[in-house]
């Protein structure tokens, strides 16, 4: 029997719903994405799915209320972990070099007998949900309003996947 990969699991259970444009799994240990899938960009022959989910540490310039500028180093995985620990992200969440505005955190969100911590973030014409699934996994899904995907349906698809992931991990299936 052929081994069922994380990539196949993400493709078959999330991307195939057409409710998300991309999905990735990150480690609860460091917040770094270790597997991802994405709908190909027909307008970009050089499209790389990893560019949506990972960028090496980088610096951004931040302006405070007095107009003073400072430099901040962005470590994407760490920003995700900090958001879960603190329950918010005042500077937003950065993923693949893109800034997402932190909208809210639902700690202990109940879904079909399971409890998840779910963060919702937005950007122009889209956004993402980040779900602490348990079992060492963090699920990240991106949705694109230009592809007729929306915040609610993408969140439901992500929660259904999270439930299936935690149940399959509990039984050793994934």
UniProtKB/Swiss-Prot annotation:
Q: Which GO terms describe its molecular function?
A: actin monomer binding; phospholipid binding
**Which UniProt keywords are listed?**
Actin-binding, Cytoplasm, Cytoskeleton, Lipid-binding
User: InterPro entries from the xrefs?
Assistant: PFN, PFN_sf, Profilin_apicomplexa
Localization recorded for this chain is: Cytoplasm, Cytoskeleton
Pfam families linked to this entry: Profilin
Q: Where is this motif: Plasmodium-specific profilin mini-domain?
A: 47-53
**Complex formation:** Binds actin.
Protein name stated in the entry: Profilin
């Amino acid at each position: 029997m052929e081994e069922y990969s994380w990539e196949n699991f993400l493709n078959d259970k999330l991307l195939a719903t057409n409710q998300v444009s991309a999905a990735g799994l990150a480690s609860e240990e460091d917040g770094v994405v270790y597997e991802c899938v994405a709908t190909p960009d027909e307008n970009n022959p050089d499209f790389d799915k990893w560019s949506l989910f990972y960028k090496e540490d980088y610096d951004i310039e931040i302006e405070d209320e007095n107009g003073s500028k400072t430099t901040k180093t962005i470590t994407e995985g760490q920003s995700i972990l900090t958001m879960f620990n603190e329950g918010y992200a005042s500077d937003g969440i950065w993923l693949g070099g893109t800034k997402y505005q932190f909208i809210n955190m639902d700690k202990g969100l109940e879904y079909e007998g399971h409890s998840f911590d779910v963060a919702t973030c937005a950007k122009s014409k889209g956004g993402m949900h980040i779900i602490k699934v348990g079992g060492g996994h963090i699920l990240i899904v991106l949705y694109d309003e230009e592809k007729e995907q929306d915040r609610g349906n993408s969140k439901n698809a992500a929660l259904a996947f999270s439930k299936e992931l935690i149940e399959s991990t509990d039984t050793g299936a994934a």
